[in-house]
Amino acid sequence: MVQKKRLEEHFDEKLFIAEMKAKSKQEALEELVDVLAESGKIRDKSLILEMLERREALGSTGIGNGVAIPHGRSLAANQIMVVFGKSSKGVEFDSMDDAPVNLFFLILAPPQDRANQYLPFLGKVVELIKDSAVRSRLAEVESYEDFLAVLSEGQSDE
C-alpha cells in the first residue's frame, strides 16, 4: 500500500516567506517565484512567471477569504514545489470576493505527474484553508516551525 504524503511533507523551509514585501498582484507573483529561484529549485524565473500570468488571465487564483493559490504545471518543475507567503498588510489580487490576500500558496508541478499528486495536493490545501480557524492561525505564524504546526494540526488523519 502506498503511503500518502502529509501536506507538510511537500513544504520546505527555504520556500517560506514570513512577511511578504509585495504591494501588488504582479509583485506578489514575482516574490513567490524569486524564492524558488533563490533556493535553487528553478533556473528560469521568466518561464514560471509567464505560466502564472497566463493562468491568472484565465481567472484569478485569489479564491477569497484572504487566500490565493497561484498554481500550474511547468517543465521547470521536476516535483511538486510549494511556496508559502504571508502578507500582514494584504495584497490586492483580484480575488473572487474582492478582499486583499494575506496567505499565498504557490504550487508548481511537472507536466507529467506520474504519482498523480498535484490535484490531490491542491485539493488538500483548499480543504485546509476552508477552515477559518486555520486561516487565522496561518495569518499569525512567524516561523516555519509555527507554520508546520498549523498544517499538522489542521489536517485530519486519513
Regions found by a protein language model. Give the residues of each.
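Cytosolic covalent-transfer regions centered on His/Cys nucleophiles
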Residues: 1-158
